[in-house]
Amino acid sequence: MTQSNPNEQNVELNRTSLYWGLLLIFVLAVLFSNYSFN
C-alpha cells in the first residue's frame, strides 16, 4: 500500500512514451529524407 509504485509506473510510462516519440520522429525523418532525395 505504498505510494512509490504508482510513481515508478508513471516514470516508466513517461520513458516509454518518450522512446516511442523519438522513434516516430526518426521514422518520419527517414521517410522525409527518402521523399526529398527522390
UniProtKB/Swiss-Prot annotation:
Membrane topology label: Single-pass membrane protein
GO CC terms: chloroplast thylakoid membrane; photosystem II reaction center
Secretion signal span: none
TM ranges: 17-37
Chaperone in keyword set: no
Family affiliation: Belongs to the PsbL family.
InterPro entries registered for this protein in UniProt: PSII_PsbL, PSII_PsbL_sf
Single GO biological process annotation from the record: photosynthesis
Subunit text: PSII is composed of 1 copy each of membrane proteins PsbA, PsbB, PsbC, PsbD, PsbE, PsbF, PsbH, PsbI, PsbJ, PsbK, PsbL, PsbM, PsbT, PsbX, PsbY, PsbZ, Psb30/Ycf12, at least 3 peripheral proteins of the oxygen-evolving complex and a large number of cofactors. It forms dimeric complexes.
Record keywords, A-Z: Chloroplast, Membrane, Photosynthesis, Photosystem II, Plastid, Reaction center, Thylakoid, Transmembrane, Transmembrane helix
The protein's name: Photosystem II reaction center protein L
Described purpose of this protein according to its UniProt entry: One of the components of the core complex of photosystem II (PSII). PSII is a light-driven water:plastoquinone oxidoreductase that uses light energy to abstract electrons from H(2)O, generating O(2) and a proton gradient subsequently used for ATP formation. It consists of a core antenna complex that captures photons, and an electron transfer chain that converts photonic excitation into a charge separation. This subunit is found at the monomer-monomer interface and is required for correct PSII assembly and/or dimerization.
Organism: Cycas taitungensis (Prince sago)
Protein location: Plastid, Chloroplast thylakoid membrane
Pfam families: PsbL
